[in-house]
Amino acid sequence: MERAKILVWDLPLRVFHWLLALSFAGAFLTAESERVRDVHVTLGYTFVGLLAFRLVWGVIGSRYSRFASFAFGPRAVLAYLRSLLAGRPAHHVGHNPAGSWVIYAMILLGIVAGAAGHAVYNDVGGRWLESLHEGSANAMLALVMVHVAGVAVGSFAHRENLAVAMVTGYKTGRPSEAIGGTRPVTAVALVSIVLLLWSGVLEVPSMSTGTADAATARGGDRPHSSSPSHRRGHDG
C-alpha cells in the first residue's frame, strides 16, 4: 500500500513534549541563581507533573503514545542501531527502538531528579541528595543531546523531518497506521493546569512589591517574606 502523510502523534503528546523541553531548559538555566529560585522550583514541579501525565498517557493515550507501542527489548535496539549504521534503517511509524530507551531513561532520571530536588528544597537528607539531584539533571542533559542527535540522524536517514512531525503530528506511513483523532480536550486541560500552576508563582512578585510599598508608606517594618525562596536547597 502506498505511503502518505498520516496523523501519528496526538495533540496531548505534542503539547507534553514541548512543555517538558521548556521546563527542563528553564530549570537547568535557573539552577544556580538564588534570585529566581521560585521560578526554578516551579519549573521543577512542572517537569515532574508533566512526567506524571506522560505515565498516565502512556496507558490511556492514542496508539503511538502508549508504552505498549514502543516496548522494545535489547535485541530490537541493537538491530535498529545496526540497520542505522548500515544506512538502511528500519522505518517505524511511532518511536523507534533506540528512541524508546531514551524516553524511558529520561522518565526515570526525571523522577529521581524531582524527588531528590523536592527533598533538598524541604531540608530533608543531606549533601548526597543535592549531588543526586544535580547528577541526574546533568545525565538528563546528556540524554537530551543524544535525543537531538538521534532526531537529526533519523531525519536524514528517513528523509523525514522528525522535529516538525512533533509539531504537526504527521509522519509518513500507511493510511491504516494513522490514529483516529488529536484529543484536543486533553491537550487544553493539560495547558490549563500548567497555566494555573504558574499563575500563582507569577503573582508573588507583584504581591510582595505591593506589600513592601505599603509598609514603606506607613513607615513600618519591612514585611517578612514567606516565599519558598528563603528556604535553603535547590529543586528541579
Residue spans for each PLM region:
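Membrane-embedded alpha-helical bundles that constitute the cytochrome b-like, heme-associated redox core
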Residues: 1-236
